[in-house]
Amino acid sequence: MRSFQAIAITLVVLLAAGCNSNDSASADADRAQGGAGSSSQGDLPRGSEPVKLDPADFTTRIDNPYWPMAPGAEWVYREAGPEGTEQRVEVTVTNRTEQIANGIEAMVVHDVVSEDGQPVEVTDDWYAQDKAGNVWYLGEDTAEYENGKVTTRSGSFETGVDGAQAGVIMPADPQDGMAYRQEYYKGEAEDEAEVLSTDEQVEVPFGYFKGALMIKDLVPLEPKVSEYKLYAQGVGPVLTVKTSGGSGREELVSYSRAG
């Protein structure tokens, strides 16, 4: 269990550093929304700043080592909530593409969250990769379900529509301290991220990984909420730990490569 202890120790240290008051969470959000950041972050967008993207610079062939998305690839996760609930999350890279309003052709990734065999949330996420290798998040079409019926589509957005801006879901070359936005649709989707480490150890039901990438996700719309996500090269997301605003753990159970 050496890997579990390593990740647990890392998270304990991070929590100890940030549990003093809401000031820490506020500082994180301020930093992600435009404070001084690492010089290595290049031109990655932050906060609500507009960004102009040339469709000619993008492809649906996503081969970023920290999150390769070849059509047919599938990840299955087990998510344990704070009240003992357990959900199954299936993420599948489809063969479909979506023409985004800003002109970029995006890969469609289908995400289904279910509980007791019934869907509770179904989402189509839209991604594309630029020439540098950054994977951009261009929007989503999401629906939440209750008793088989859609209850809300809150959180859906499309880059180029109603002021929505693209964000980066995975940098080409993640470096410690790098900060950037993942999505921006005012009042609906404003997630930010910060790279914490590129040399973690992690163990999940699917396997044990060294050299994992750890990213902290921040939600300015919900200042008390933060998550730590770990990515393994050649696989993608393997573990998400929610450490404030409640608790929870989502771990990779199986992964099938395309073909």
Predicted feature residues:
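Bacterial N-terminal signal peptides that target proteins for export
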Residues: 1-8
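Hydrophobic alpha-helical targeting segments used for export or membrane insertion
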Residues: 9-13
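C-terminal motif of bacterial Sec signal peptides marking the signal peptidase cleavage site
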Residues: 15-18
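Conserved functional acidic sites
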Residues: 20-259
